Amino acid sequence: MAKKIPSIVKEIRNNPPSPINFAFQKNISYSQMSIFRGCPHRWKLQYKDKIKRFTSSIHTVFGTAVHEAMQHYLDVAYETSFAAADRDINMEEYFQEAYIGEYQKQYKSNKSEHFSDAAEMREFFEDGVAILDWFKKKRSRYFSKKGTYLVGCELPIVIAPNKMYNNVLYMGYLDVVTYCETTDTFKIIDIKTSTKGWNDYSKKDENKQFQLLLYKQYFSEQYGIPLEKIEIEFFILKRKVLDIDDENIMSPYQAYRVQQFSPPSGKIKLGRARKAVNDFINECFNSDGGIKDKIYPKTPSKWTCNFCPYKEEKELCEAGHDFM
């Protein structure tokens, strides 16, 4: 007999937010805010001037495909059972289809020019298969149906962070949200792919932390869930790991394909995340939602300029060429 789904889970599933009306509303996102905090001028080129540049890579293709495979597995597992998911889903085939499909999509977006080669494509594919195989074998460490329900994958958030700017809406999609009936708590999980996992520097990167902090804040506001009943976690999938018998291994965790990290999310941290969004909105938007016509400063550095899609175009920005 199927478990009775808790009413709070049904309520969230059945009440998605109203879609953005782009005729008069503007959407912002974590990625937009992150770009602005790195370099306001880059944000202006992309979002005000609408000068789009191809930014995908084998890393983004890989990440999208792994996300899709993981989310499909969890959808089936929680809808039926983990045994059924293990039996009925060929993870390698599903991942391969998603991987090839996403590459083809981005290939077309790149004016039908390749941005990877066969050797690199094969390496990343084999890494993905290894991650998914390891996850299936160790799944019970991370996900269970005992008193736990899947609220959804790619759960949408659409909300106005600043009520003085009602036409500026924050939009995001939560990778995985679960609900534990025993403790009456929700967990928001953000899946990340990484070469070797996150080091201490990455974990302490406040800009990275803001993504989940804002998801927690806005999930709470959108569905009326107390903040203290919401947990957050980065679920980091590693492409490269040491063998458990490797002489250089310092900890068994170095052989794990999964790394979990829950950033602090108390009042102070949430306050800093809210301030970052409000500062972004105040700097960039008018009260009616229009983008301000102003000078957006350039903040050149080796890090920001190296990853900037406009770095070769001096007519758009010459500030970073000393760092190239």
Annotate each predicted stretch with a short phrase.
Residues 149-220:
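Non-catalytic protein-protein interaction segments used by genome-maintenance enzymes to assemble
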Residues 33-34, 38-79, 125, 129, ...:
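Nuclease catalytic cores
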Residues 80-85, 162-167, 180-185, 223-226, ...:
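Short, solvent-exposed loop/turn segments that connect beta-strands within catalytic domains
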